[in-house]
């Protein structure tokens, strides 16, 4: 009887359940979207119970639709949208407020106040993160400050906090396991990534009671078992947890120091495994925990690009220049170059290494001869220039020259982007056969804990190359194009709305 690992990929807009066999191949997928709530401008929230219901639905569907029995599931791995914050009643199990999503800016004033009080460097040194509404800590404080009776209840031990992984493990285990893993804990602004413990000073600054925090565990370990009534009467080990970008790093088998993966999703996320060293960034990168496994922790440098694949959606939905995302490739390849046109897609500001939240999108170099093809090509090229910006920052901070770039996410299907990426970073780009690397990473972590896979070497053998893109552009051309991009970014930052 064939066994499988069930991976739950709980994302920002949908929940997915994916079955993987021992070769790391997909044996079934189910997906369900859920509602986004926008109570005020810049606020983004989810209903944690809707997320839980969607997860139950996809787990049931993937098993039923693929003629798999529950006793064929060897273990469950969970990967999640990071930073999204849930606070719930320990006794009733009900969330006391909507889940505050990673994108939400409703805690900006808390961050500003802590910065004014001079604590930015304290947070940076201990957590590797920026003092920004993006991360979970200020979201917990906001809920405790704004929900009536919440703070008193928390101080009396009546509330629990968790990122989405914690919430799902708690629900699946029938309230038995209140845990998170190192990768998710490292995104909270409350966890000291050097001591590997919740930090009392940071908790005091955020006024968050320690008793509501989950226990922090390795990313690969049996945390508990499914309560029988949630899983067809079976008690299945819940055995792997990692935040989505760290899970993708693991799913890409980036196990060695200097290994890098880049995800081209709505935004772009590049992570470099820095081994057992937490590298302090001087270039606007985040220092974070990649995963904890085999009794030790691996660290990573992370760069964030705010607009990546969503630039292609903008061409389709906003400008109506294309009817479908794949069409962008055929338009881009009809011309040999952009004829000097640059698109800087700073629609919501610029991420790593600029961190300029006030910059807005801009286009440079238009002439009467500029056609739709040039414009589309320039938009696609912008994804690659931004990736080089991040990669250069990583090499500078780590002292490691990137030898190859493993890629995943929706935009990697576009061969033009992949080739231009290789050309502009002067590094080979490797596209894997299985591009569901986030879910695969969670499956691998769970599978290692239950003996489904023996070792990381076992997993590395599963990684198969679909296509490799080697750089073909000459050095002079590459540097001339990149100088133009840097000039365009500089001009974008000069031109800001009043």
UniProtKB/Swiss-Prot annotation:
Sn-glycerol 3-phosphate binds at residues 12, 82-83, 134, 244. Its EC number is 2.7.1.30. ADP binds at residues 12, 16, 266, 309, 410, 414. Keywords: ATP-binding, Glycerol metabolism, Kinase, Nucleotide-binding, Phosphoprotein, Transferase. ATP binds at residues 12-14, 266, 309, 313, 410. Pathway: Polyol metabolism; glycerol degradation via glycerol kinase pathway; sn-glycerol 3-phosphate from glycerol: step 1/1. CDD domains: FGGY_EcGK_like (cd07786). Activated by phosphorylation and inhibited by fructose 1,6-bisphosphate (FBP). The keyword Cell membrane does not apply. GO terms for cellular component: cytosol. GO terms for molecular function: ATP binding; glycerol kinase activity. The phosphoenolpyruvate-dependent sugar phosphotransferase system (PTS), including enzyme I, and histidine-containing protein (HPr) are required for the phosphorylation, which leads to the activation of the enzyme. Glycerol binds at residues 82-83, 134, 244-245. It comes from the Bacteria. It catalyses: glycerol + ATP = sn-glycerol 3-phosphate + ADP + H(+). GO terms for biological process: glycerol catabolic process; glycerol metabolic process; glycerol-3-phosphate metabolic process. The keyword Nucleotide-binding applies. Belongs to the FGGY kinase family. Homotetramer and homodimer (in equilibrium). PANTHER family: GLYCEROL KINASE, SUGAR KINASE. This is Glycerol kinase. It comes from Staphylococcus aureus (strain bovine RF122 / ET3-1).
């Amino acid at each position: 009887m064939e066994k499988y690992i069930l991976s739950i990929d709980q994302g920002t807009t949908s929940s997915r359940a994916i079955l993987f066999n021992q070769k790391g191949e997909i044996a079934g997928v189910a997906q369900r979207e859920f509602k986004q709530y926008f109570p005020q401008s810049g606020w983004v929230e989810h209903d944690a119970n809707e997320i839980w219901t969607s997860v139950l639905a996809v787990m049931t569907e993937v098993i039923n639709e693929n003629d798999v029995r529950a006793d064929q599931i060897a273990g469950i791995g969970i990967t999640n949208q990071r930073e999204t914050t849930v606070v719930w009643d320990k006794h009733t199990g009900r969330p006391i407020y909507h889940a505050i999503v990673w994108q939400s800016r409703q805690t900006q004033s808390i961050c500003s106040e802590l910065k004014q009080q001079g604590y930015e460097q304290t947070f940076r040194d201990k957590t590797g993160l920026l003092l920004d509404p993006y991360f979970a800590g200020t979201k917990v404080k906001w809920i405790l400050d704004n929900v009536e009776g919440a703070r008193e209840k928390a101080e009396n031990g009546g509330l629990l906090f968790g990122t989405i992984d914690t919430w799902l493990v708690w629900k699946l285990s029938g309230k038995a396991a209140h845990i998170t893993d190192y990768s998710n804990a490292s995104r909270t602004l409350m966890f000291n990534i050097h001591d590997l413990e919740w930090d009392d000073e940071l908790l005091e600054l955020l006024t968050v009671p320690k008793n509501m925090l989950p226990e922090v565990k390795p990313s690969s370990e049996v945390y508990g078992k499914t309560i029988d009534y949630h899983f067809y009467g079976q008690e299945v080990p819940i055995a792997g947890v990692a935040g989505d970008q760290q899970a993708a790093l693991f799913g890409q088998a980036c196990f060695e120091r200097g290994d890098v993966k880049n995800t081209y999703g709505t935004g772009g996320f590049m992570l470099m495994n820095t081994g057992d060293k937490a590298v302090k960034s001087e270039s606007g990168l985040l220092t974070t925990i990649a995963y904890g496994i085999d009794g030790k922790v691996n660290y990573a440098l992370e760069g964030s690009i705010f607009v990546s694949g969503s630039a292609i959606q903008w061409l389709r939905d906003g400008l109506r220049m294309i009817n479908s995302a794949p069409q962008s490739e055929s338009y881009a390849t009809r011309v040999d170059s952009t004829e000097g046109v640059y698109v800087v897609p700073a629609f919501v500001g610029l991420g790593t290494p600029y961190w300029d939240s006030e910059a807005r999108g801009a286009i440079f170099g238009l002439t009467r001869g500029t056609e739709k093809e040039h414009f589309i090509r320039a938009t696609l090229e912008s994804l690659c220039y931004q990736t080089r910006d991040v990669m250069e920052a990583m090499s500078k901070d780590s002292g490691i020259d990137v030898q190859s770039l493993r890629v995943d996410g929706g935009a990697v299907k576009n061969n033009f982007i992949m080739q231009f990426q290789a050309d502009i970073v002067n590094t080979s780009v490797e596209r894997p056969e299985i591009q569901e690397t986030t879910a695969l990473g969670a499956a691998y972590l769970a599978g290692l804990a239950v003996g489904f896979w023996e070792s990381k070497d076992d997993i590395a053998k599963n990684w198969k190359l679909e296509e490799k893109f080697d750089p073909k552009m000459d050095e002079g051309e590459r540097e001339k194009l990149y100088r133009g991009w840097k000039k365009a970014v500089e001009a974008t930052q000069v031109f800001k709305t009043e």
